[in-house]
Regions:
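Short glycine-biased active-site loop of nucleotidyltransferases that positions the nucleotide triphosphate
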Residues: 120-121, 322-328
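Feature for exported/extracytoplasmic and membrane-associated proteins, marking the mature portion
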Residues: 1-299, 319, 333-407
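Metal-dependent active-site segment of extracytoplasmic phospho-/sulfohydrolases and closely related
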Residues: 292, 299-323
Length: 407
């Protein structure tokens, strides 16, 4: 068996930490000279969440005319929206986010999306994750390119919650995957002292494969130390912690602890609500809101240096369909949370829900390229120059700043 095959089997063993191996990784190509203490967490809602039932324009008659069965009632009505600014209201299932809105640590950007309109889940997720719309062949994620700029000798600098590296983090720079299930962080053969000793002796050199093995072992030790209590509970048949609230607690621990994680990614599915949307959305939004509020709380003072970005591939139709659901749309909300956010108000362009103002007479139009808010975050929080931002998002001309971050 080849050395590379052996290492890949170790690295990709489903029971432990996963570190993708690459001959182009930072262990062989050098480090950036742009260190930063700021942190970024991306939460991707796969399936296209209905942003119009997240932040509701309850003052518009067209909202209720188009959604007789699935509209959220105005404030002061049973299960009505939570008023935000006298015009928009928050879905009551997200009540846990209201304190962040009142503290001006939460904002929403209207009409975000992929400017070359596309309603294919696969293609739009691909473009949003690789950051190069129109290029289906590119399989390198924009967060991996960002990691290449920020990279330090830290094997847990970028962490994905999940066992498979998502496209947004794929690339030449190694990232760490933390399995969603606690019992997936079980012992590996390399945890057996005699086996560990043999592998340590075999891969103690300075070649790229040896360095990759060494960094993988270092990262695994950090993870085991950070989640020692959880691993003990798991051995006593503790329930799975794959739910979002528990996952964000792990992420906060990694960012504030020895792992010193700087970039984090979590994805959540089942947002494609074509049928009986109200019940589905309520079931999904409650743990999402609770989890985001928990993440802010668990980060503590570190929340001031952290930006949490919640995004989805596209929005949904303004008009409900015949199955009390909605279909694939265009513009959507981008959610941004953080201690240095100029929150408590909205950004982006909102027109109306009149048919003449909608894209193709049916969708919220895309008025803000999804890369624009991210570029603002990279510029302000990570102090990236336009040239470096262009490395993250090639061929994207960043327009006027949305100015939603305090310097």
């Amino acid at each position: 068996m080849k050395r590379r095959t052996v290492l890949q089997q170790i690295a990709l063993f489903t029971g432990g930490l996963i570190i993708p191996l690459s001959s182009n990784s930072w262990v062989s190509k050098g480090l950036s000279k742009n260190p930063s203490q700021k942190k970024l967490i991306v939460v991707f809602l796969r399936g296209a969440i209905d942003g119009l039932n997240v932040v509701i324009p309850y003052q518009e008659d067209e909202y209720y005319n188009n959604r007789p069965n699935i509209a959220i009632l105005p404030p002061n009505e049973p299960n009505g929206v939570l008023d935000l600014d006298g015009y928009f209201g928050l879905n009551p299932a997200l009540k846990d986010l209201m304190p962040l809105w009142k503290k001006k640590q939460l904002t929403f950007i209207h009409g975000c999306g992929l400017e070359n309109e596309n309603r294919s889940h696969f293609e739009v997720q691909h473009y949003m994750e690789n950051g190069t719309p129109g290029n289906l062949k590119n399989d390198e994620g924009w967060m991996n390119r960002l990691l290449g700029i920020l990279s330090s000798k830290n094997p847990t600098q970028a962490v994905n919650i999940g066992s498979v590296t998502p496209e947004i983090l794929r690339g030449s720079i190694p990232v760490a995957n933390l399995p969603r299930e606690k019992d997936n962080l079980q012992k590996l053969s390399t945890d057996i002292p005699i086996v560990n000793k043999l592998f340590n002796e075999l891969y103690n050199g300075n070649d790229s494969l040896s360095l990759a093995y060494q960094e993988g072992q270092k990262a695994r030790k950090i993870f085991i130390k950070e989640f020692e209590n959880e691993m003990v509970e798991s051995s006593k048949n503790a329930p799975s912690t794959s739910n979002f609230v528990q996952e964000v607690k792990k992420m906060a621990k990694l960012m504030s602890g020895e792992a010193n994680t700087q970039l984090g990614f979590i994805d959540l599915g089942q947002w494609d609500t074509h049928i009986n949307q109200s019940a589905q959305l309520n079931r999904l939004l409650m743990p999402l809101g609770e989890g985001l509020a928990t993440l802010a709380l668990e980060l503590g003072n570190l929340f001031n240096d952290t930006t949490i970005l919640v995004m989805s591939e596209f929005g949904r139709t303004v008009k409900e369909n015949g199955n009390k659901g909605t279909d694939h749309g265009s513009g959507n909300l981008m959610w941004i949370l953080g201690g240095n956010i100029k929150g408590g108000k909205f950004y982006g362009q909102w027109n109306t829900l009149e048919k003449k103002a909608l894209f193709e007479g049916r969708d919220i139009p895309i008025t803000t390229d999804f890369r624009q808010p991210i570029s603002n975050i990279l510029s302000t929080n990570f102090d990236l120059s336009p040239q470096l931002i262009n490395q993250v998002f090639p061929n994207f001309n960043s327009k006027n700043s949305l100015n939603f971050i305090s310097v």
